[in-house]
Regions:
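Beta-rich, blade/repeat-based domains predominating
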Residues: 112-124, 158-181, 192, 225-241, ...
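A short helix->beta-strand "capping" segment at the edge of beta-propeller domains
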Residues: 90-114
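Short loop/turn segments that connect beta-strands within beta-propeller blades
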Residues: 143-147, 211-215, 260-265, 321-325, ...
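Long beta-sheet-rich domains in secretory-pathway and surface-associated proteins
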Residues: 511-624
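Conserved beta-strand positions in repeat-built beta-propeller and related beta-rich domains
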Residues: 123, 130-135, 197-203, 247-252, ...
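Blade-level signature of beta-propeller repeat domains, shared across WD40, Kelch, NHL, RCC1
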Residues: 475-512
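A short loop-to-beta-strand structural motif that recurs across blades of beta-propeller domains
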Residues: 138-140, 206-209, 255-257, 315-318, ...
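Generic structural signal for coil-to-beta-strand starts
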Residues: 127-128, 180, 196, 244-245, ...
């Protein structure tokens, strides 16, 4: 099914992709341009709605649906009503209430109202966090040591500052820790700390650099464009500090762009070269539906990895060898046809990739072609305004029985977005629709998810306020769209695009409980037969004092794109309990694969959650 929203400015379409991210792939991945030739391509969107439409049954009368209709008029009606609607949708509530923080995450409201922060990067040498306001057009910094906002620098030529209903997305922001030779000398003398700041600019189809030594900006024009959308939509940027080069890609350009820092000149395209990505594997698909996801630079093998997709149809991973100047192409299976975020592991042996429009992330071994899928926990009921975790089966602890599931759609996905490698080899990714930050440790296959305190009802399928069916007054998501890892301070910093906040996740805080699976790491189960798995939850002696909420047992699996069990069943002997009076609790998880489940290898995620975190372990499952 396709839906067409016409007469919407291209940049405003990002709103649509976030309000209904199941029907519309995140950052502008799924826009086609055409409706009988009557609508200009840059004002037309073709939205691909597949079987994984998040809460489609609930959205018709939702408040978000009303906001969507109003938002479609934003760029053509600069009226008081349009401005008010824009501010309600994108500007957050501008409060500094402590309720928007917990023992793991602290959120900070930005110095100005309605900044719409997106790109963010930790400057480890300067002990700062840098971010860009996509609305105000400022580059801001936050002092990590002093825990306060430092300074905001005005970016020149940022037209959205003057237009009350406009913005320009800055998806990627990086710190060049090496900088120029002059800058290195200044660092040695203590005159300046940290390297120059690089970031993308969608609307001006450009790359910016902020030079710390002179506190000035330079802009470099991308020497190419999209005839359909008016911008390459630069979305992912990497820096090679040894060769003084930057690499970047644009959503609407099948190209790898390489910038030679020694030759790039302010206000021009000089020093930027274009490498065309071979797209023959996408033959038969409208080129406007073929988009570039992101890149990852592999310094050990001097290569650039690129994800490319036609959402729901075809996905490929490319490796560009910078020495040989050649591409190697890796075809992906149909169920992983939407690769987005890409990260290279510590040994440069595996890629870790997020799959757009699902709850899936996976490991790809380029040498063998072997793929191992993992899945997040299922979308929390809190996203939909439900405080109580209720699953089918009349409260008997059943996780999935193919029947009713309260007001939670089986098709609700968490949307793992970007993915980054930490210094210890673990992987971080943001669950944009799940409203969580997640850490996965490949060494022990442990997934830890941290709940984002802020929720915005305008960005979710929420029940009416005052509903007496057990629904909560809090609902929705915070739109965590980008993040950066601080290796020095064991912190992860992230932006909340529609909430006017940046957040800090303190990874040093102890988890309130641990989860141990008694069974071996790999199980074989026959279809139609049940298998018991012992799970032990132990309270941490060093758990934070605030972590005293009830424990909920949770499970998910790679049987479906959302982590749902489909027609298979799984239930806990006890699903909800308190750890206030006991040090540990053992429960049994019983799993029975359905007879119609295809034989093969799957991943079962079993764990527990409280109000703040989810703690899961992965078990390999062979279904025969």
């Amino acid at each position: 099914m396709f839906k067409i929203f016409s007469s919407i400015c291209l940049l405003t379409l990002i709103l649509v992709s976030l309000v209904f991210p199941t029907s519309i792939l995140l950052p502008l991945q799924q826009y086609a341009a055409a409706e009988e030739g009557l609508i200009q391509k840059t004002h037309t969107m073709l939205v691909h709605s597949n079987t994984n439409d998040n809460l489609a049954n609930n959205k018709k009368n939702s408040q978000a649906d009303i906001k969507l209709r109003n938002a479609s008029l934003i760029t053509t009606q600069s009226t008081t009503a349009a401005v008010k609607n824009f501010q309600e949708t994108f500007c957050g509530d501008n409060t500094t209430a402590t309720s928007y923080s917990n023992g793991y995450i602290r959120e900070n409201t930005l110095p100005q109202s309605c900044e719409m922060p997106l790109g963010i990067a930790v400057d480890n040498n300067a002990h700062k966090v840098w971010y860009v306001s996509t609305k105000k057009g400022v580059l801001g910094s936050y002092d990590i040591k002093q825990n306060k906002f430092d300074q905001e620098y005005i970016i020149p030529n940022w037209n959205s500052r003057e237009n009350p209903v406009d913005y320009s997305q800055v998806w990627s922001l990086k710190v060049d820790d090496s900088g120029s030779r002059k800058h290195q000398q200044q660092q040695q003398r203590g005159e300046v700390r940290g390297g120059d700041i690089w970031f993308t600019d969608v609307k001006q189809n450009a790359i910016w650099k902020f030079i710390k030594s002179s506190q000035s900006f330079e802009v470099y024009k991308i020497p190419g464009n999209s005839s359909s959308f008016g911008t390459t939509y630069p979305i992912s940027l990497e820096i090679d500090r040894k060769s003084n080069r930057i690499f970047f890609v644009g959503t609407f350009s099948a190209s790898l762009w390489i910038g030679d820092m020694t030759k790039m000149k302010n206000g021009t395209s000089e020093g930027i070269s274009q490498i065309h990505i071979p797209t023959s594997g996408f033959n038969g698909i409208d080129p406007v539906l073929i988009t570039t996801g992101s890149i990852a630079f592999d310094s050990k093998k001097n290569s650039v990895w690129i994800s490319m997709l036609s959402y729901g149809r075809k996905g490929e991973i490319f490796r560009y060898d910078l020495d040989k100047k050649s591409f190697e192409i890796f075809d992906l299976p149909r169920d992983l046809s939407s690769p987005l975020g890409v990260a290279v592991d510590s040994n440069s042996e595996n890629l870790w990739i997020t799959n757009a429009g699902t709850s899936i992330f996976y490991k790809l071994n380029p040498d063998s072609g072997n793929i191992i899928k993992f899945v997040t926990s299922k979308t929390s009921p809190k996203v939909f305004g439900d405080d109580v975790i209720t699953h089918g089966g009349g409260g008997n602890g059943q996780v999935r029985d193919g029947g009713n599931e309260s007001n939670i759609s089986k098709n609700a996905y968490t949307l793992p977005y970007w993915i980054q490698k930490d210094a210890d080899g673990s992987l971080w990714f943001n669950e944009q629709e799940g409203n969580k930050m997640a850490r996965f440790d490949p060494s022990n296959m442990k997934l830890t998810e941290y709940w984002i305190p802020t929720q915005n009802r305008l960005w979710g399928n929420c029940p009416p306020r005052g509903n007496n069916n057990g629904s909560s007054q809090t609902c929705g998501i915070a739109n965590v769209l980008q993040f950066s890892i601080s290796h020095n301070n064991q912190q992860v910093w992230f932006t909340e695009w529609s909430e006017n906040k940046i957040g800090k996740l303190d990874t040093k805080s102890h988890l309130p409980f641990s989860v141990v699976i008694a069974s071996q790491k790999e199980l074989t189960v026959k279809r139609g037969e049940s298998r018991d798995i012992k799970v032990k939850v132990t309270a941490s002696q060093s758990a934070p004092s605030f972590a005293k909420s009830n424990i909920h047992m949770i499970a998910s699996g790679t049987f479906t794109p959302t982590g749902d069990f489909g027609n298979s069943t799984g239930y806990f002997s006890q699903e909800i309990f308190s750890m206030s009076d006991v040090k540990s609790k053992q429960v049994t998880f019983t799993f029975r694969p359905s007879m119609d489940l295809n034989p093969g290898k799957y991943m079962l995620m079993i764990g527990a959650e409280d109000e703040y975190i989810s703690n899961l372990r992965a078990i390999k499952l062979n279904v025969i």
